[in-house]
């Protein structure tokens, strides 16, 4: 039986990645909806993108009412802005919440109905073009066909999926991660570690995902402590951005396992940051599956020099 491997159409990474992607972004449409959050507006991070759009003569509207654990109500409000402003493509600037929100808004803009309607279904209708610019090194959402949105009526986190949710362009520019505080750096970095290690020990692992997962694990162990101690270290931030991207590619194709399966309800019920809930479960979950993936855990240990 063969394997399928899905990635964004184009990936720009490293220093000045946004600038390198500028000409491509300008071809995606006439007016962008920039999906972001209040902190990215306050820090001026979103302005880095809107300045580029101004330079390229691309019109845009901004929807910045995204908070952690985005909800179906936020998606509905964002869709209203998208339609009212006659936008035809989307750019997300932020952590996993704005990127997941962008995907959900894009999906409903073409599929219709409410995002809640797609729980348990594969989203298949093509979306408008999407650009994902992460400001944390962890979620990997810029390289996945998944989005997680909270259903406010049922108080559950919905895992929604479909290849059409894969962003067309992923931009991992370390300049966007320099303002992440220590707490966010640690939590999102551990999220990336869980993505990579779960993908590597998954029954769905394949040769290509193995390469991405092991590369990510090695980078995370080397560079996450550096980023935590010195958030202004551009090289370390660049390597962590790349590691998060690699981990996202790995789990997008190999899936995550027991850690993420158990952490999702914790986040929904107690609103614990996603990376923290994963970290809380990591030791217990991997102890539980250790015997079934002994050789795989040995491989990971060798990669980090244990």
What residue ranges belong to the model's regions?
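Structural motif
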Residues: 10, 31-33, 60-61, 88-91, ...
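ATP/NTP phosphate-donor binding region
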Residues: 1-89
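Glycine/threonine-rich beta-strand-loop-alpha-helix active-site module
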Residues: 73-175
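Carboxylate- and glycine-rich phosphate/diphosphate-binding segment that chelates Mg2+/Mn2+
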Residues: 146-254
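Short glycine/serine/threonine-rich phosphate/pyrophosphate-binding segments
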Residues: 18-21, 42-45, 72-73, 97-103, ...
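Glycine-rich phosphate/pyrophosphate-binding beta-alpha loops
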Residues: 138, 245-275
């Amino acid at each position: 039986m063969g394997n399928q491997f899905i990635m964004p159409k184009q990936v720009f990474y490293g220093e000045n990645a946004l600038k390198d992607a500028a000409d491509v972004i300008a071809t995606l449409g006439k007016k962008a909806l920039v999906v972001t959050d209040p902190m990215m507006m306050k820090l001026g991070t979103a302005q880095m993108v809107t300045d580029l759009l101004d330079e390229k003569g691309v019109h845009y509207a901004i929807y910045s009412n995204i908070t952690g654990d985005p909800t179906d109500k936020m998606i509905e409000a964002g869709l209203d802005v998208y339609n009212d402003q006659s936008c035809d493509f989307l750019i997300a600037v932020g952590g996993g919440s704005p990127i997941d929100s962008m995907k959900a808004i894009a999906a409903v803009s073409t599929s219709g109905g409410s995002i809640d309607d797609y729980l348990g279904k594969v989203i298949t209708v093509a979306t408008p073009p999407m650009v994902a610019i992460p400001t944390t090194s962890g979620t990997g959402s810029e390289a996945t066909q998944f989005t997680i949105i909270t259903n406010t009526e049922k108080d559950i986190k919905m895992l929604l999926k479909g290849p059409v949710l894969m962003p067309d362009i992923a931009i991992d520019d370390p300049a966007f991660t320099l303002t992440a505080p220590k707490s966010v750096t640690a939590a999102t970095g551990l999220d990336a570690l869980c993505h990579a290690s779960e993908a590597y020990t998954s029954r769905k692992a394949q040769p290509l995902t193995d390469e991405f997962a092991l590369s990510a694990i090695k980078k995370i162990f080397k560079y996450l402590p550096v980023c935590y101690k010195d958030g202004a270290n551009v090289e370390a931030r660049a390597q962590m951005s790349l590691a998060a991207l690699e981990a996202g590619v790995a789990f997008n194709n190999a899936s995550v396992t027991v850690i993420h399966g158990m952490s999702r309800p914790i986040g929904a019920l107690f609103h614990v940051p996603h990376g923290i809930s994963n970290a809380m479960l990591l030791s217990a979950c991997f102890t539980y599956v250790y015997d079934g993936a002994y050789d795989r855990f040995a491989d990971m240990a060798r990669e980090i020099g244990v």
